[in-house]
Regions:
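Bacterial N-terminal signal peptides that target proteins for export
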Residues: 1-8
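Bacterial N-terminal signal peptides
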Residues: 8-19
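Serine-dependent protease modules
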Residues: 22-265, 271-274, 315, 319, ...
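Conserved PDZ fold ligand-binding element
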Residues: 79-80, 280-315
Length: 354
């Protein structure tokens, strides 16, 4: 009988220590994942995009056209997400981690970088916030974590590494987004707008599901945090990004060479907008058109070859050199006019809102 008594005591002691043994069985990496999830998940929200259509009798017929993810960065209820998550919304509904729902107001949007800002008026104690880290410090191979709502499955965590840096993808409006982060962390439809976190739980990117919309194929993409940090002040203050421009209509000379015209690499200026940066700097557009085969080609304009000594041969090259700067900044443009290589300093001015 005493043997049964000792066995019972042993089993009680063993089971009483089981939770402790279970906790200690987590690896250091697993513990880090758990800590980051617990620290970050209350800052991640689901955003439902509601469109309102009307029937024959003009009765409103709201319908959810899609959903995505966002994350809160400020106790005033500021949410960062993708532009394509909120595009064309008649109504936005934001669901917090505690399942409470709040109307969202679109504060600002930048289709060119697929980013948008939404605000909610919810009690500050009903959510947490995330902090940004500078994406210029990240390296290929480092661990990353993605939080979001893939396929409507809320509060989902996936992990991976940074697979590559400096990728270029197309935004929904066709513009190229430069400097994209590539990761093997699973990013699926519904993850759009969610945070890509480093091992400290700080945001280094904004996940996007633009590419591979049919589902994850082991390649995910994120807009770098430095892009968001650069444009957020404008989105919050003006609702859009105030970008500088040259005020030219350029033609990549590669197209001219395809029809048999011998011209150097660069951008031929077809037209200069009066009063814009290029006009003020004295750059010239085409003075006439010439017929080449069945084509009418603008001719006689300056050919831009470099900006700040960096070759410029495509529209994407030009956008990268201009739109990442601020109005008032100066750039040096190298160009060819009448077979002479010249340069000029140009002060950038704001692109007109229209």
């Amino acid at each position: 009988m005493s043997n049964y008594k000792y066995l019972f005591i042993f089993l009680v002691i063993a089971f009483s220590f089981e939770p402790a043994f279970g906790v200690s069985s987590f690896s250091a990496d697993e513990k880090e994942n758990i800590q980051i999830y617990e620290k970050s998940s209350r800052a991640v929200v689901n955003i439902s995009n509601i469109a309102v259509n009307y029937d024959f009798f003009y009765r409103a017929m709201p319908a959810e056209t899609g959903s995505g993810t966002g994350f809160i960065i400020d106790k005033s209820g500021i949410i960062v997400t993708n532009y394509h998550v909120v595009e064309n919304a008649s109504k936005l509904v934001v669901t917090l981690a505690d399942n409470s729902q709040w109307p969202g107001k679109l504060v600002g949007a930048d289709p060119n970088n697929d980013l948008a800002i939404v605000r909610i008026k919810a009690p500050a104690d009903s959510y947490d916030i995330l902090e940004f880290s500078h994406s210029n410090n990240i390296v290929v191979g480092q661990k990353v974590l993605a939080l979001g709502n893939p396929f409507g499955l809320r509060q989902t965590l996936t992990t991976g590494i940074i697979s590559a840096l400096g990728r270029t993808i197309a935004a929904k409006n066709g513009r190229k987004i430069e400097g994209i982060i590539q990761t093997d962390a699973a990013i699926n439809p519904g993850n759009s707008g969610g945070p890509l976190l480093d091992s400290e739980g700080k945001v280094i990117g904004i996940n996007t599901a633009i590419i591979g919309s049919a589902g994850s194929v082991g390649i995910g993409f994120a807009v770098p945090s430095n892009t968001a940090l650069r444009i957020l002040p404008d989105l919050l203050k003006y609702g859009y990004v105030r970008r500088p421009w040259l005020g030219i209509e350029p033609i990549p000379t590669v197209y001219l060479r395809r029809i048999g015209i011998d011209v150097p690499d660069g951008l031929l200026i077809a037209r200069v907008v009066k009063g814009a940066s290029a006009d003020q700097a004295g750059l010239r557009g085409a003075s006439r058109t010439v017929k080449v085969g069945r084509y009418q080609v603008p001719w006689g304009g300056d050919i831009i070859t470099h900006i700040n000594k960096i070759p410029v041969t495509t529209m994407e090259d030009l956008a990268q050199q201009i739109e990442t700067r601020k109005a008032g900044e100066e750039i040096t443009i190298h160009y060819i006019r009448n077979d002479r290589v010249l340069s000029v300093t140009v002060e950038l001015v704001l692109r007109p809102r229209s």
